[in-house]
Amino acid sequence: MANIELRAMGDEDWGEVASLIYDSTNAWYVARGRPPIFAGPKDGPILFCAVYEQLDPGCCVVAEDRDANRLAGSCFYHPRSTHVSLGIMNVHPDYFGQGVASQLLRYVTEVADRQRKPMRLVSSALNLDSYSLYNRVGFVPRAIYHDMIQK
């Protein structure tokens, strides 16, 4: 298992986080027989870093593989007056199934616990990997929304 250290995302991490979002999201779609959703330069998702850092400064945790000197995962979170909302979480395909997402989720859960606030998230029930992770750590469906896309 990798030597993972959790820490706050710094400005110097934006490019690697963008590439991580690009790679992990595309890998998830391709593994399910769908085309990648990101195309073009791997730094395209840097927009997530810019927007979320402006909205909630300092509220992204990264999982760094200290031995490989690279990021294994990232998770944005959004403290609000009544709750902490879980944002975009990504794990690099090389680290799928190694507990990185669980570590990131535990970190954000501890943030919410320290603030004495509940956690909330919106997630697709069709994403069984995420649904399973969230269910294992105690999240339960509260409301169901029907979502459709145009083909």
Regions found by a protein language model. Name each.
Residues 79, 92-94, 98, 126:
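Active-site acidic-Proline motif in GNAT/NAT acetyltransferases
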Residues 18-60, 66, 71:
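Active-site rim helix/loop that mediates acceptor-substrate recognition in acyltransferases
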Residues 118-123, 140-151:
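Conserved catalytic-core motifs of GNAT/GCN5-like acyltransferases
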Residues 86-87, 112-126:
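Conserved GNAT acetyl-CoA-binding A-motif
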Residues 5-19:
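A short beta-loop-alpha structural element at the N-terminal edge
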Residues 127-145:
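Internal alpha/beta loop-helix hairpins
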Residues 91, 97-110, 131-136:
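Conserved acetyl-CoA-binding loop-helix of GNAT-fold acetyltransferases
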Residues 60-62, 69-78, 85-90:
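Conserved beta-strand in the GNAT
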